[in-house]
UniProtKB/Swiss-Prot annotation:
High-level lineage: Eukaryota, Metazoa, Chordata, Craniata, Vertebrata
GO CC, alphabetical: membrane
GO molecular function: bitter taste receptor activity; G protein-coupled receptor activity; taste receptor activity
Function: Gustducin-coupled receptor implicated in the perception of bitter compounds in the oral cavity and the gastrointestinal tract. Signals through PLCB2 and the calcium-regulated cation channel TRPM5.
SS bond list: none
InterPro entries assigned: TAS2R
Residues annotated as signal peptide: none
Locations listed in the record: Membrane
Family the entry assigns: Belongs to the G-protein coupled receptor T2R family.
Expressed in which tissues: Expressed in subsets of taste receptor cells of the tongue and palate epithelium and exclusively in gustducin-positive cells. Expressed in the antrum and fundus (part of the stomach), duodenum and in gastric endocrine cells.
Source organism (scientific name): Rattus norvegicus (Rat)
Name listed for the protein in its UniProt record: Taste receptor type 2 member 123
One GO biological process term: detection of chemical stimulus involved in sensory perception of bitter taste
Pfam family for this entry, one: TAS2R
Primary subcellular site in the record, as a coarse category: membrane
Amino acid sequence: MFSQKTNYSHLFTFSIIFYVEIVTGILGNGFIALVNIMDWLKRRRISTADQILTALALTRLIYVWSVLICILLLFLCPHLSMRPEMFTAIGVIWVVDNHFSIWLATCLGVFYFLKIASFSNSLFLYLKWRVKKVVLMIILISLIFLMLNISSLGMYDHFSIDVYEGNMSYNLVDSTHFPRIFLFTNSSKVFLIANSSHVFLPINSLFMLIPFTVSLVAFFVLFLSLWKHHKKMQVNAKGPRDASTMAHTKALQIGFSFLLLYAIYLLFIITGILNLDLMRCIVILLFDHISGAVFSISHSFVLILGNSKLRQATLSVLPCLRCRSKDMDTVVF
């Protein structure tokens, strides 16, 4: 079934997009980590925001390299990739990387919210004065969700492998006894790997909704803070572009970009779960898989554009790259 619908041009397109993602992911996240680490070594200190940014960039670097290694193992050692132990290990690695990528981005949004927003509420002031502890507590609480997620995925993964190995000719797509996400078939090994993450989608998406909800609440409360601040400025007859308003606006722009990318990512996951006919199309399958990497890579470049230090470092690097490119052209010609 899979081999009849698969077009090699789709696989070629996927390969091109995949390698572009790998290169841009390494460059973007590597740049964030390098700039912050060099600044840390130079100043002998690092801010909480830069700590979160650096950890986020390193996590996404690990994610990109793990995806690259898994794909290389698939093509170079397919017999090794088909082992249940390797199948489980790949799933756990992707879940852990995705978990920390999303939760660290959520922590960054909560940090900006507590630092920039202004309320007279006693609970808010208590959290604002202890923002570092709040971020640390969020990370620790997220570890509980991670353990639950891995445990749940372990049960699903073990079940799917047992079914696949126990009845090699059985097509789970046509079965009403199993969830529609089990799309394993014996027609192609590539199809097995391409659909392996869909075993995890229903449970994993539920855990992904938790940080999304936290980020959404922080975004709307920050927007409420900006609205109250704007009304206060109108009463005091001050200009609309004061420092607090600009800080609110920049944080809201970054938060909105994150939520938009996050919502698109979740939309593709939910679409993959609910639409069986859609999932039979290899183009949608491949696009669904690369959407996760696109989300993290796009958000990394949003962070670069939204951070003054990273943006300034980018502007200082670009002239050097142009000069090096001109030198290479001179050598060639």
